[in-house]
Amino acid sequence: GTATLALASNGTGTSGLTELTLAPQTVNVSGSVYRLANAVINNAGTFSFGNVHVGDTVQQALSITNSAANDGYSERLNAGFGGATDGRITTSGSIAQLAAGATNASSMVLGVNTAAAGAVNGMATVNFASDGTGTSGLGITVLPSQSVTVTATIEGGVYRLASPVIQTAQPVNFGNVRIGTAVTPRALSILNSAPNDGYSERLNASANGTTGGVTAGGSFTLLAPQGVNSTAIQVGLDTSVAGNRGGAATITFQSDGTGTSGLGITALPSQNVQVTGNVYRLANPALNTPSVTLAARVGDAGPTASIGLTNSSPDVYTEGLNVTRGATAAGFTSSGGIGNLAAGQTSSLNAIQVALNTGTAGSFSGTQALAYVSTGAGTTSSPDVSVGSGSVTLAGRVYTPAVASVNTTPVDFGIVHVGDVVAARNVAVTNAATATALNDVLVGTINTGGSSSFSAAGDLGSGLGAGQTNNTSLNVQLNTSIAGIYNGAANLALSSHNADMADLPLATTAVALSATVNNYANPVYNRVTGDGTLSGGGLSYTLDFGEVVQNAAAGTTTL
């Protein structure tokens, strides 16, 4: 604004002259008046935290407004905490230069230290100042402090959470059990280890999920501090599948304020209960020898065959296999058995054997019965239980051996000439065995052992049955190329033969051979006297009289 000044010159004390009016002057006047900041705690009074848990984070921000008019002539507000009457009251934060008309509801926080249980009562002081920075420039003016009454605000008790402890020794071991066997569940012993001083909540617990072959169930609520529940929650083992069925059961815990803090339910960390147990399947017999065929000749030592079995299993979780013999078909005998054959193993070579009786010729058939048992010995210790039966098909043939009889007496080719063609001589043989239910046939060949004078050929083909004779297939031949007196033998290689066994060589006596091969007479002619000429030699000569006159006297020659 402006101010007009009336001016006069006054000589009093100087010139002594009378006052002289001077011309007036106008003065321009400028300036600003700033009001101080005005602090208002919007949520002053009681901060009611109620009942809280030990370890909870308990805090609340003050809402502070600079209520001075926002017209450009109000200073800004600073705020900060002073002291607190209870050491468990916590303060943090401050406010700087809060503009007129503005509110800060986050920077300054009041809280409670919940490290220990008990009641908390107290008061916190908030200091304020009006700050001219950026407005009046007049610096900082201290304003009256204000108190936030905490007596009612933080008067609730501080409660600790329930503290679960699983007392049952772990792992809970169910040992080895047979597949499908009902397993008695084991109850867990659970303690609420929180102190029983009136400031601890109660404990809720429930089974909630498993791994592996573990089962779990049950729950309880409101277990008092220092209380133990050893019946409500149980763990077990699912025995429907063989193998290592161990795993874990998850137990979910809650701290329940019902009847204590009134704070409702607070989730606590879950805990796992380790469970072990192995489930064994029953023995699984696999018959490796579904059939047996044996052959022998009457009077032989009885041939035997092994019956093999495997306890078939994909892993070690299989009980042992016992095998005992049942009825054995007529014509056969059996022996042996199998005891506690381990998973995946095959019986030893001679564990179970069947033998063919060789007292009577004939064909025999039937079965060998087997009984299978799963034994818990060494695994589950469960009682033996039948796992079925098996049957091995038996077939046996007992042959009466052939009996070789050589019917031909010594063969004499007589006296022949060198170069003669001499007919072969046959050697007759008979299978002299008595016909029975099953007979070998007689087979064989003939030879002369490399003789240069005699040779032999032929065989008995498919063989001679009991009582049959062959007098055409085996023969001997004389070599007449060289004169001489010859003796030799025809050897018979005869065997008892059937389709199931190796041939049985039969002893025979060689057939004696004899022959005389003579040269023809060999005349030699010489001309002694007479006509003509004589030529030639051996068996062919020519007497040549040359040319003669017809009707002339006959020529004569003496030889």
Enumerate the language-model features and the residues they cover.
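Feature for long, exposed domains in two main contexts
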Residues: 1-559
